[in-house]
């Protein structure tokens, strides 16, 4: 059974969808940002299905946006779960602040190159920097390769690397 656990974010997009895969190993797909309200909602969602964070055995990260990966380190520490992500995301997650800073610099440079006024580009970068502490370094125990497989007792998922929404 795959269960939807909606987790609130402070972003205009609203909730992020996290998924609990009730199989062996017990797996959570995406985490929400590292905020108290997000963690509380995730814990409540797990409890609705008779689970708690400490029961998690695997965490799968779909891409590096903070609303999808922010709680990964906290959940991995509390549960001891294996963390899986597409291979290009592994070094990014293991150097959180360095990576997110580089993304912000790239975004600001891109805006400036395309004619966005400096004060607006700087304002966007400042806003983005305010989110940096909503995630932190986490070791990716299992980098996933495009076309590879993620095994469960009752199913196998094919890994598909489809960048576009994010670089990873």
Give the residues covered by each predicted segment.
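Short, glycine/acidic-enriched loop or turn micro-motifs at the edges of active sites
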Residues: 33-35, 66, 164, 168
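Conserved beta-strand hairpin/beta-sheet module of binuclear metal-dependent hydrolase folds
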Residues: 1-49, 55, 98
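Glycine-centered loop/turn positions within well-structured domains
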Residues: 27, 67, 91, 157, ...
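Core dinuclear metal-dependent hydrolase active-site scaffold
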Residues: 20, 147-168
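Conserved beta-strand segments of alpha/beta enzyme cores
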Residues: 1-3, 82, 142, 156-158
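Conserved beta-strand positions that form and line the central face of beta-propeller blades
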Residues: 4, 28, 143, 149, ...
């Amino acid at each position: 059974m795959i269960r939807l656990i909606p987790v609130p974010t402070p972003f205009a997009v609203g909730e992020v969808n996290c998924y609990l895969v009730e199989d062996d190993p017990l797996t959570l797909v995406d985490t929400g940002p590292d905020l108290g309200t997000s963690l509380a909602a995730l814990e409540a969602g797990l409890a609705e299905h008779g689970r708690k964070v400490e029961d998690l055995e695997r965490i799968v990260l779909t891409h590096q946006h903070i609303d999808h990966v922010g709680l990964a380190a906290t959940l991995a520490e509390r549960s001891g779960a294996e963390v899986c992500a597409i291979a290009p995301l592994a070094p990014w997650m293991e150097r959180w602040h360095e990576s997110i800073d580089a993304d912000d610099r790239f975004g600001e440079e891109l805006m400036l190159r395309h004619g966005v006024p400096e004060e607006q580009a700087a304002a966007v970068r400042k806003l983005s920097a305010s989110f940096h502490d909503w995630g932190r370094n986490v070791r990716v125990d299992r980098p996933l390769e495009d076309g590879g497989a993620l095994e469960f007792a009752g199913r196998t998922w094919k890994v598909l690397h489809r960048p576009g929404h994010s670089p990873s």
